[in-house]
Amino acid sequence: MENSKLSDRARGIDLIVYDFDGVMTDNRVVIFQDGAEAVVVNRADGLGVAHFRDLGIPQLILSTETNPVVKARAIKLRLEAITSCKDKKIALKSYCAQNGYDLNKVVYVGNDLNDLEVMKIVGFPVAPADADPKIKSVAKLITKSKGGEGVVKELSDYMMGS
């Protein structure tokens, strides 16, 4: 990605991919009597997403969840989302091939074991502070923020050299 506003860290990124639960949320869910679920997100992450969008960096949410809250948040953030994904590695490889993205130029933010294999194939794996230790072991960046506490905003600040 060529853009004069990009820092050296952000230059060359083809795509940023986020897991949802445990990255944009604190991994907790509220279940109502009717079975509906709700999560809490951090508005600062919305600022991080907007910053990357303003710089022209494509972004994607990739989740195994079937919960409609993931799609609702993606719509609010104006992000594409792949949900109900059985194998994130296969899904991301396919998505990148279809869209001409180089996996070596992909940033992937994940927190749990279902992110491990996909994090091994991207160029820049990122983990929240409270990620599973196996995830942290493959991450090139571990944020100071825990999941749901501004991980995406912190990544945005880091990529822009702030």
Regions found by a protein language model. Give the residues of each.
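Mg2+-dependent phosphoryl-transfer enzymes with acidic/Ser/Thr/Gly-rich catalytic loops
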Residues: 35-39, 81-82, 89-162
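Short coil/turn segments at beta-strand junctions that form active-site/ligand-binding loops
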Residues: 12-14, 57, 104-105
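Acidic active-site catalytic centers that drive phospho-/nucleotidyl reactions
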Residues: 19-21, 45, 111-115
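Non-catalytic pre-domain segments flanking phosphatase-related domains
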Residues: 1-20
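A positional/architectural concept
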Residues: 24-54, 64
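Substrate-recognition element of Asp-dependent hydrolases with the DxDx(T/V) motif
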Residues: 23, 49-73, 82-83
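N-terminal active-site wall of soluble small-molecule enzyme domains
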Residues: 42-49, 66-71, 84-95, 113
